[in-house]
UniProtKB/Swiss-Prot annotation:
Region described as Disordered: 188-221
Domain notes: The cytosolic domain is involved in S100A9 interaction.
Protein name (record): Cell adhesion molecule CEACAM3
Biased composition (Polar residues): 203-217
Domain Ig-like V-type: 35-142
Glycan-carrying positions: 104, 111
Superkingdom assignment: Eukaryota
Membrane association type: Single-pass type I membrane protein
Gene Ontology annotations of biological process type: regulation of immune system process; signal transduction
GO molecular function: protein tyrosine kinase binding
Length: 252
C-alpha cells in the first residue's frame, strides 16, 4: 500500500499570498485629495474691467472661508469672510465695495484698478477646524497703453501713410499749377511786341505819350512874323488880272 497523497488544499503558494496582501492594502488606502488652487480669469485684465478668482478642489465639510489681500492671512488685509451655515458675508478692512464672494468660495472683483494688482489668499476653515490656504494673483493693464493689438497698429500705420500720400499729392498739384501759370505768362510776354529803346524810333505808345510833351515844347510863332504874313495877303496884285485879259485877247 502506497503512501497517502497530500491534500492539495493544504499547500500555500507564496505569490498568491502577496497578491492578496497588496489588494487589501490598496483597498484600505484612502484616496489622495486634490490640492486647493486658485485660477485668475483672466490672468491679465484691462483697467476698469472685472476679474474672477475661481477656486478649484474646494474641500468638503467646511465651516467657512475668507479672502485676504496679499500672500498671508492678516486681519488688516481681510477683504470678506463667509459663514456657510448662516450664508452671511462679513466685509473686512480691505473691502472696497467692488468685491463679491460666491458660495463656491470664488471672488469677483469689478472695476479693477492698478492698486488691485498683486496676490490674493483664500483661507478655508474645515468643520474639524483645520485650515487650508491657497494664493492666486492677476495683473492689470491700461487699455490705451502702448501694447496695442497688431490690427490696431496696422490700422494706425495705414492711416498715417494714406495721410502722407494725400499731402504729397496736394503739394505736387499746387507746384504743377504754379509752374503752368508761370509758363503761360512767359509765353504771353514773348508774343507781345517789345518797346523800342529811346532814340531808335517811335512807337504807338511812345508817340501818344510824347505828343503832348512835343506840342508843349514847340516854339510859338513870333507875333511880328504873323502880322507881316497877314499884310501880304491883304495886298491886291492888279497885274495878275491884266495879264489874264491880255492873254485872252491874243487867243481870240
Amino acid at each position: 500500500m502506497g503512501p497517502p497523497s497530500a491534500s492539495p488544499h493544504r499547500e500555500c503558494i507564496p505569490w498568491q499570498g502577496l497578491l492578496l496582501t497588496a489588494s487589501l492594502l490598496n483597498f484600505w488606502n484612502p484616496p489622495t485629495t486634490a490640492k486647493l488652487t486658485i485660477e485668475s480669469m483672466p490672468l491679465s485684465v484691462a483697467e476698469g474691467k472685472e476679474v474672477l478668482l475661481l477656486v478649484h478642489n474646494l474641500p468638503q465639510h467646511l465651516f467657512g472661508y475668507s479672502w485676504y489681500k496679499g500672500e498671508r492671512v492678516d486681519g488688516n488685509s481681510l477683504i470678506v469672510g463667509y459663514v456657510i451655515g448662516t450664508q452671511q458675508a462679513t466685509p473686512g478692512a480691505a473691502y472696497s465695495g467692488r468685491e463679491t464672494i460666491y458660495t463656491n468660495a470664488s471672488l469677483l472683483i469689478q472695476n479693477v484698478t492698478q492698486n488691485d494688482i498683486g496676490f490674493y489668499t483664500l483661507q478655508v476653515i474645515k468643520s474639524d477646524l483645520v485650515n487650508e490656504e491657497a494664493t492666486g494673483q492677476f495683473h492689470v493693464y491700461q487699455e490705451n497703453a502702448p501694447g496695442l493689438p497688431v490690427g490696431a497698429v496696422a490700422g494706425i500705420v495705414t492711416g498715417v501713410l494714406v495721410g502722407v500720400a494725400l499731402v504729397a499729392a496736394l503739394v505736387c498739384f499746387l507746384l504743377l499749377a504754379k509752374t503752368g501759370r508761370t509758363s503761360i505768362q512767359r509765353d504771353l510776354k514773348e508774343q507781345q511786341p517789345q518797346a523800342l529803346a529811346p532814340g531808335r524810333g517811335p512807337s504807338h505808345s511812345s508817340a501818344f505819350s510824347m505828343s503832348p510833351l512835343s506840342t508843349a515844347q514847340a516854339p510859338l510863332p513870333n507875333p511880328r512874323t504873323a502880322a507881316s504874313i497877314y499884310e501880304e495877303l491883304l495886298k491886291h496884285d492888279t497885274n495878275i488880272y491884266c495879264r489874264m485879259d491880255h492873254k485872252a485877247e491874243v487867243a481870240s
